[in-house]
């Protein structure tokens, strides 16, 4: 482990030198790649450097205690030694987590699809609540959220909304959101005050770059048609809506939000590439899960992952048994408590899996 840490530190120092090299600075693509690599290793190096200081401090304190000290000095040295040993344990745990294999998709942007499922109008309204929640969370993180396609219902909900969220490490935080989200509340139209249960589904996919997945033109059928539905004045005037069908997988993506056929096609390609890439990832994950139990369910899209209970202001994440009485804050985009708990659970499970062989 320590040889690995030392090689990471050596590479970090090398990156520092490279990033001040005029030849690298003038090559924007390489400079960005190396900057990203440096940023990804910085925390590991900082923790390792502190660890080395602590180990040295323990050695010094033990050496000091082996000498003839007066009672007060001996007590101070013992106290310092005790504190340093505790810190060493904490740092060792952090190092183990930092050295866990990284999900190669963690630093990617995402495409998120939210759909009203069981529950009709109430499900569509809840899909809208989730959409707003993720938008607010993205804003708080300093990310950019862009709507690619929205199918709005007459009462202000969403049958379906697709958005792209861009920024630093988006997938690493939002990958746990895929699954069925259940809501329990009294609809505004319910005169008897009965609680209704509805469901919305969320799918989170890493954005796939062209270099990662190449979609051959011969494998894509393109259909152009007139926009319909809540498209406003340009409905049926121009054939701007685009439907792409990936023939090998049967995946279909339709876009009509933009007036421009070209823009709709660009957006549709983004979503299609992400869906095909995601299907490949899901198949690989299913194969892995068949041999080993996955820590936190990030794959099974039918899995009920969370319940939002309005009368009790309660949110429960069923995967980790976490219940929080702050539904109003969570729907306002304050998701950190849930996401941090999911990340920690996932990391702890992976550590246990590694230790158990």
From Swiss-Prot:
Pfam family, one: PCRF
GO MF annotations, alphabetized: translation release factor activity, codon specific
PROSITE patterns per the UniProt record, alphabetical: RF_PROK_I
InterPro entries: PCRF, Pep_chain_release_fac_I, Pep_chain_release_fac_I_sf, Prokaryotic/Mito_RF, RF-1
Gene Ontology cellular-component annotations: cytoplasm
Subcellular location: Cytoplasm
Name the record gives this protein: Peptide chain release factor 1
Gene designation: prfA
């Amino acid at each position: 482990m320590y040889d690995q840490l030392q090689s990471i530190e050596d590479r970090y120092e090398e990156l520092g030198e490279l990033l001040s090299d005029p030849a690298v600075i003038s090559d924007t693509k390489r400079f960005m790649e190396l900057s990203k690599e440096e940023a990804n290793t910085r925390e590991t190096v900082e923790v390792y450097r502190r660890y080395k200081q602590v180990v040295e401090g323990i050695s010094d304190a033990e050496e000091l205690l082996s000498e003839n000290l007066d009672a007060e000095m001996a007590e101070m040295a013992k106290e310092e030694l005790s504190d340093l040993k505790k810190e060493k344990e904490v740092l060792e745990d952090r190092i183990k987590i930092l050295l866990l294999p990284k999900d190669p998709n963690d630093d990617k942007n995402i495409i998120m699809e939210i759909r009203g499922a069981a529950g009709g109008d109430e499900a569509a309204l809840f899909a809208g609540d989730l959409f707003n929640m993720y938008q607010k969370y993205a804003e708080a993180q300093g990310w950019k959220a862009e709507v690619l396609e929205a199918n709005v219902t007459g009462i202000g909900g969403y049958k379906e909304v697709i958005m792209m969220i861009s920024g630093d490490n988006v997938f690493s935080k939002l990958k746990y959101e895929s699954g069925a989200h259940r809501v329990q509340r009294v609809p505004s139209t319910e005169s008897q005050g009965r609680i209704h249960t509805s469901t919305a589904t969320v799918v989170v996919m890493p954005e796939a770059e062209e270099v990662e997945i190449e979609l051959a033109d011969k494998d894509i059928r393109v259909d152009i048609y007139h926009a319909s539905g809540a498209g406003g004045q340009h409905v049926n005037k121009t054939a701007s809506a685009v439907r792409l069908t990936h023939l090998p997988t049967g995946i279909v993506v339709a876009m009509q939000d933009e007036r421009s056929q070209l823009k709709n096609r660009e957006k549709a390609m983004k979503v299609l590439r992400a869906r095909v890439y995601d299907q490949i990832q899901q198949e690989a994950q299913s194969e892995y899960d068949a041999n080993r139990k996955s820590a936190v369910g990030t794959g099974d899209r039918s899995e009920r992952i969370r319940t939002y209970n309005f009368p009790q202001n309660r949110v429960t994440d069923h995967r980790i048994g976490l219940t929080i009485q702050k539904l109003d804050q969570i729907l306002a985009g304050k998701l950190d408590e849930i996401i941090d708990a999911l990340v920690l659970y996932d990391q702890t499970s992976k550590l246990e899996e590694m230790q158990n062989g």
